[in-house]
Amino acid sequence: MSDDAGASFSGGDTDVRELPSATSARRQRTTDQWFQWAAFTRDGKLATSYYDRQYGDDERTGWSDFSLSGSRGLRHFGVTRVTSSSMPPPTQFAGGFFGDYTGLAADRVAYPAWSDTRTPAPVLCPGTGTPGHPPRLCVTPAPNAPYNNDQEIYVAAVRVPSG
């Protein structure tokens, strides 16, 4: 903890980037991961799911992905990207609220669940939906993303990596 704007920290002098991580993947040691869940498979593998900014330029743009890390012996961790492409920041709430609606279940494989923001949230196009002008839907830009979007719950069945 720091009480002098980061000039010093209590709790030891180890650089936090050198502390154990849920994965030993090179890019994940220096990027953001958050809202994690953990579960064990039937055969004893640890699975950990979380939002992740290690892909592309997510750390700079604020976009994110969902990842799954796994280990059998807790010494070496593997990581799998669960999302097929990065998600823009959420746009529904002022201030960029990102719902913490995540979860993880496991049996033979892992079932991570997350709030996905890749689906645009269309609105009624201006000047439509009136007499003589049939309604049309438009996708509009957002202040913090290329388009307004919805947070939808996604679930995937994913083999747990071993590392």
What is each model feature region?
Residues 1-163:
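Extracellular, repeat-based ectodomains that mediate carbohydrate processing or recognition
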